[in-house]
Amino acid sequence: MSSHKESSEYEMQYRSTIQPRTAVRSQSRQSGNYVSGGNGAGSGGRVLKMVTEMGSATVGGISPALSANAAKSFLEATDKEKKTLQGLNDRLGNYIDRVKKLEEQNRKLVADLDELRGKWGKDTSEIKIKYSESLSTARKDIDDAARRKAEVDVKVARHRDDLAEYRSRYEDIQQRRESDREKISQWTNAIADAQSEVEMLRARFKQLTDEEKRVTADNSRIWEELQKARSDLDDETIGRIDFQNQVQTLMEELEFLRRVHEQEVKELQALLAQAPADTREFFKNELALAIRDIKDEYDIIAKQGKQDMESWYKLKVSEVQGSANRANMESTYQRDEVKRMRDNIGDLRGKLGDLENKNSLLEKEVQNLNYQLTDDQRQYEAALNDRDATLRRMREECQTLVAELQALLDTKQMLDAEIAIYRKMLEGEETRVGLTQMVEQAVKTHSLQQQENTDSTRSVRGEVSTKTTFQRSAKGNVTISECDPNGKFIKLENSHRNKDENVGEHKIRRKLDGRREIVYSIPANVVIKPGKNLTIYARDQGGINNPPESLVFDGENTWGIGANVVTSLVNKDGEERATHTQKTIQSGQ
C-alpha cells in the first residue's frame, strides 16, 4: 500500500505551455504510459503523459510584437519543459535506486524474475522494433519539414519577385499617370488660351460689328446729307435760273425802257426842233444829263445785280461742290472701311471656325484622355487589389507553413525528449531486475490501455481551441476595415485614391449574436478623404471627437462583443453599402 502511494506521487502529466493559435492546425500526441511495480494492489505505478496541441492561426498578418512574444513564450516553455524532463530523469534515477532496494526485499519472487529474464531479449527486441519505427517516422517528419521549409523558401522568393514586379508596374503606372496629368495640364492650358483667344476674337468681332453698324449709320447719314445737298443744288440751280430769268426780264425791261426813252428823246428832239434854239439847247443839255444819269444808274444797278448773282452763284456752286466732294470722300472711305471690315470679319470667322474645330478636337482628346485615365485608374486599383489579395494569400500561406513548421519542431522536441528517456531506460539498465520488471510492466500496461480505460490512469482533459474568421464586403469605395474585438471602435476606410466620400447621415448597424442591435447615425457633412480612415469610438474608450478623423458614439460605452457579430454601413436611402462579419468557433479535444 505504501509503495502504491509512493508511486502515485510520481504520477504526473506533461502539457505544452504554448497557447492555442487559431485557424492553422491542431495536432495531439500521447506517449505510452509506464507503470512499474509489483503485481497487485500494492504495486507502484507511474504514468507519463505528453500532449502537444496547436490551435489554428487567425487569418491575417502576424505583427512583429506578437511574433516576439510568441518566440519568448516558446523559449520559456522549452526551458520549462527541459527542466521538467530533467526532474523526471532524476526522479526516474531515484526510482531505479528504490527498485534496487525493493529487489532485496522481494527475494521470494526470484522464480518469477528468472521466468521474466527469459523474456527479456524478446521484449527488448520488440521495444527496439517498435521505437525504431517511431524514430523512422520522426526522421521522416523532420525530412518532410525540411522539404516543406525549402518549398516555403522557394515560394517566398517567388513572391518577393512578384512583389518587386508589382512594385515596378506600380511605379510605371504612377509615372505614366503623372505624364498624363502633365499632358492634361498642358492641353487644359492650351484650351484655356484658345478659349481666351476665341473670347478676344469674339469681342473684336463684336467691336467690328458695332463699328460697321456705326459706319453704316454714318454712311446713311452722309448719304442723306448728300441727297440733301443735291436737292439744295437743284434748288439753287432753279433759283439761279429764276434769277437769270429775272435778269433777262430786267434786261428786256431795260431795253424796253431804253426804247421808250429813245422814243421820248425823239419826241423831245422833235419838240426841240420846233422850239427856239435856246430852249432846244437847254433841254438838249438837260436831256443828255438826264439820260446819262439814268444810264449810269441802270448800269450801276445792272452791274451790282450781276455781281451779286455771280458771287451768290459761285458761293452756292462751291458749297455744293465741297459738300459733294466731302460726301464722295466719306463715301469712298466708308466703302473702303466696310470692305476692310468685311475682310477682317471673314478672316475672323475663318479663324473662329478653325479655333472652334481645334477646341472641339482638344475637348475630344481631353475626354479620351479622361476615359483612358479612368481606365488606367481602374486597372491600377484592380492591380492593387490583386496584389493585396496575393499578399494576403501569401501571408496566410506563410503563417500556415510557419505554424506547421512550429508544430513539427515541437513534435521533434517532444520525440527527442521521449527518445532520450527511452535511451536512458534501455542503455545500461537492461541487466537490472527492477528495470526489467518496470519495462515489462510498462509494456503490459500500455497494451492494456490501448484496449480499455483502467482505473490506474487519469483521463486527459481536452484543451479548447478558438477559431475566429472575418469577412468583409463593400459596394463602393467605403469599407469597414476594422472592428475592435473588444468593442472599443469601428474603423471606416475610403479605398479610393483621389475621390472624397461623403458618409454624412449614414448609419452603422451592429447586430450581436442575432439578438441585440446597436445603431449609430453619422453626423451630416462628414467626408472621408482618399485613402484615409474614420474611427468611431464608443464612449469612454479613449477616442476624441475630431471629424473627419475620429468620432465618439455617446450613446453606448461599447460596441458590444459576441460569437457572431455583423456590422453594416447603411446610406441615407437605406441601402447597405458595406458589411463586416465576425464569427468565433470554439472546439475542444
Curated annotation (Swiss-Prot):
Residues 81-433 form the IF rod domain. Residues 14-30 have a biased composition (Polar residues). One of its GO terms (molecular function) is structural constituent of cytoskeleton. Residues 117-130 are annotated as: Linker 1. Residues 85-116 are annotated as: Coil 1A. Gene3D superfamilies: 1.20.5.170, Lamin Tail domain, Single helix bin, Vasodilator-stimulated phosphoprotein. GO terms for cellular component: apical plasma membrane; cytoplasm; intermediate filament; nuclear envelope; nuclear lamina. One of its GO terms (biological process) is nuclear pore localization. It is found in: Cytoplasm. Expressed in epidermal cells. Expressed in amphid sensory neurons, the excretory cells, the vulva, the uterus, the rectum and some neurons of the tail. Isoform a and isoform b display a similar pattern of expression. Isoform a is predominant in pharyngeal tonofilaments. Keywords: Coiled coil, Cytoplasm, Intermediate filament. Residues 466-584 form the LTD domain. Residues 269-285 are annotated as: Linker 12. Residues 8-84 are annotated as: Head. The keyword Secreted does not apply. It holds the Pfam family Filament. Disruption phenotype: RNAi-mediated knockdown results in 79% embryonic lethality and 19% larval lethality. Abnormal localization of epidermal structural protein pat-12 during embryogenesis. Residues 131-268 are annotated as: Coil 1B. Forms some heteromeric filaments with ifa-1, ifa-2, ifa-3 and probably ifa-4. Cytoplasmic intermediate filaments provide mechanical strength to cells. Essential protein, involved in attachment structures in epidermal cells that connect muscles to the external cuticle. Required in morphogenesis and epidermal integrity. Probable component of embryonic epidermal attachment structures. Functions in larval muscle attachment independently of ifa-2. This is Intermediate filament protein ifb-1. The lineage of its organism: Eukaryota, Metazoa, Ecdysozoa, Nematoda, Chromadorea. The gene is ifb-1.
